[in-house]
A protein has these predicted regions:
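Amphipathic alpha-helical dimerization/coiled-coil segments
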Residues: 2-14, 31, 90-109
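N-terminal helix-turn-helix DNA-binding core of bacterial DNA-binding proteins
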Residues: 12-54, 75-84
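Residues within the DNA-recognition helix of helix-turn-helix
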Residues: 58
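Alpha-helical DNA-recognition elements
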Residues: 61
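Glycine-centered, phosphate/nucleic-acid-interacting loop/turn motifs that mediate DNA/RNA or nucleotide
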Residues: 66
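Short beta-strand "wing" residues that participate in macromolecule-binding interfaces
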Residues: 70
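Accessory beta->alpha helical hairpin/"wing" motif in late/C-terminal subdomains of nucleic-acid enzymes
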Residues: 85-89
């Protein structure tokens, strides 16, 4: 019975997981940005293997949540889009990682 309370608590934590982060394409984007200081759009598209349109759509959602900062500019005469994980985005990834880690550890017990 006592173990049931522990399981219910863990399930509740999973039920409250950030769905914006949990979506596979956005999770890939966030993982790449977590490991680099800044990435350009082309690098991120290649790293995630998402189409430009799909990547752009997911980035818009992450930007609206203030998880990602999008900076548009030029490299010489060519347009360039630079992407950074915000402090809030980094915190969201950390929270997601910790929640998933705990849930997976509890499976082993």
């Amino acid at each position: 019975m006592e173990g049931d309370m522990h399981i219910n608590s863990d399930l509740r934590n999973l039920a409250e997981i950030d769905r914006l982060v949990h979506e596979p394409a956005r999770l890939m984007i966030l993982m790449v940005l977590y490991t680099v200081e800044v990435a350009d759009f082309t690098f991120l598209a290649n790293a995630t293997e998402l189409t430009d349109g799909n990547l752009s759509s997911h980035l818009s959602k992450l930007e609206a949540a203030e998880y990602v900062e999008i900076e548009k500019g030029y490299a010489g005469k060519k347009p360039q889009t630079l992407l950074r994980l915000t402090t809030l985005g980094r915190q969201a990834v950390d929270t997601y990682r910790d929640t998933m880690r705990q849930a997976l550890q509890d499976l082993e017990e």
